[in-house]
């Protein structure tokens, strides 16, 4: 695509060297649009799917009025939020009040720059892709803190402090789990990590993917990922029975929609990261001799992402919400020690004769 646009502007339109630069910029913009539009549509229908799944688990119907089987409900919700007035508390900080939602949403979009869907479908294939993801996602905490403080509300500020403390705490356990994957893969490039899972003692089958040899740390990662995104049962930052809606409480209309969009995009991002790091990315679970279903492709990447997203919805519908002190205790006294201990165990394992990743 990049070469096509560069040839278009340089040769066809006669812009010379300037056309090469313009073609590069245009190709990047087109790639960004190709990623963002399906991502936003996915968020819209993820909310629909969530309400349907939870309704089914609770013996309800879920959305079924707007359009056939309620399929237009996400668009109705979007129009409702867009046309609602964005009210602001009189004593709030006006500038920071509107900066908060933007700072929460921007990192969730920027993180997708390094996520590959197969060997070729990636905006930027850099060797420190995992480090970039950890860095860019940690910036969203600033948006939460700013929103809570700028609202000039005790409920908003308490929710922001809870959310930021929880995210920072579980980032440590999550990072420890990802360090284990880097140790066995020898790279922070996502394509290299997927390629490493295609090898191994199990001959590139589903049993050679990182979820099995790193199973204890895989569980630590899954729990930390849910807490990191402030989703149920770790949603004390939005505890309805205690602090109404946390740092969202003073937001309405489009400003609230930005927070909502950021939360669900982070969910999808975590599902993509889980697929790449532990579930073989675009690798097929079937032998390549089986034809199409055995061929590595973006299709399998999307299937695995959907499975992880379903897991998010399943635990929301089945587990009660933890108290805040229980969440922090689980993170600092259970998951973080397990994460660091497994790094040591894995290091010893890799230098022993029983090394599976030679």
Curated annotation (Swiss-Prot):
This is NADH-quinone oxidoreductase subunit H. It is found in: Cell inner membrane. InterPro entries: NADH_UbQ_OxRdtase_su1/FPO, NADH_UbQ_OxRdtase_su1_CS. GO terms for biological process: aerobic respiration. Its main location: membrane. PANTHER family: NADH DEHYDROGENASE SUBUNIT 1, NADH-UBIQUINONE OXIDOREDUCTASE CHAIN 1. It comes from Neisseria meningitidis serogroup C (strain 053442). Keywords: Cell inner membrane, Cell membrane, Membrane, NAD, Quinone, Translocase, Transmembrane, Transmembrane helix, Ubiquinone. HAMAP family: NDH1_NuoH. PROSITE patterns: COMPLEX1_ND1_2 (PS00668). It comes from the Bacteria. NDH-1 shuttles electrons from NADH, via FMN and iron-sulfur (Fe-S) centers, to quinones in the respiratory chain. The immediate electron acceptor for the enzyme in this species is believed to be ubiquinone. Couples the redox reaction to proton translocation (for every two electrons transferred, four hydrogen ions are translocated across the cytoplasmic membrane), and thus conserves the redox energy in a proton gradient. This subunit may bind ubiquinone. It is an enzyme of class 7 (translocase).
């Amino acid at each position: 695509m990049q070469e096509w646009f560069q040839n278009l502007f340089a040769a066809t339109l006669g812009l010379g060297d300037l056309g090469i630069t313009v073609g590069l910029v245009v190709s990047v913009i087109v790639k960004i649009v190709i990623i963002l539009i399906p991502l936003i549509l996915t968020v819209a229908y993820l909310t629909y799917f969530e309400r349907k799944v939870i309704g089914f688990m609770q013996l309800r119907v879920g959305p079924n009025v707007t359009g056939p089987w309620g399929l237009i409900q996400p668009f109705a919700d979007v129009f409702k939020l867009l046309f609602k007035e964005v009210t602001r508390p009189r004593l709030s900080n006006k500038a920071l009040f509107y900066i908060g939602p933007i700072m929460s949403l921007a990192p969730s979009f920027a993180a997708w720059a390094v996520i590959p869907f197969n060997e070729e479908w990636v905006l930027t294939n850099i060797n420190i892709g995992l480090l970039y993801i950890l860095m860019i996602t940690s910036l969203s905490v600033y948006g939460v803190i700013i929103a809570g403080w700028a609202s000039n509300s005790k409920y908003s500020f308490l929710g922001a402090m809870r959310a930021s403390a929880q995210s920072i705490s579980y980032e440590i356990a999550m990072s420890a789990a990802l360090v284990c994957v880097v140790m066995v893969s020898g790279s922070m490039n996502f394509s290299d990590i997927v390629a490493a899972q295609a090898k191994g003692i199990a001959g590139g089958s589903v049993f050679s993917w990182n979820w099995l040899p790193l199973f204890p740390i895989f569980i630590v990662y899954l729990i930390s990922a849910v807490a990191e995104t402030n989703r149920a049962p770790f949603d004390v930052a939005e505890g309805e029975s205690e602090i109404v809606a946390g740092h969202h409480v003073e937001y309405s209309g489009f400003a609230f929609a930005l927070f909502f969009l950021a939360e669900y995009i982070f969910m999808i991002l975590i599902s993509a990261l889980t697929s790449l790091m532990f579930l073989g990315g675009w690798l097929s679970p079937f032998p390549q001799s089986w034809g199409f279903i055995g061929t590595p492709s973006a299709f399998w990447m999307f299937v695995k992402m959907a499975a992880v997203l379903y897991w998010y919805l399943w635990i929301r519908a089945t587990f009660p919400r933890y108290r805040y002190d229980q969440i922090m205790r689980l993170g600092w006294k259970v998951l973080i020690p397990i994460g660091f201990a497994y790094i040591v165990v894995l290091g010893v394992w890799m230098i022993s004769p029983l090394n599976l990743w030679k």
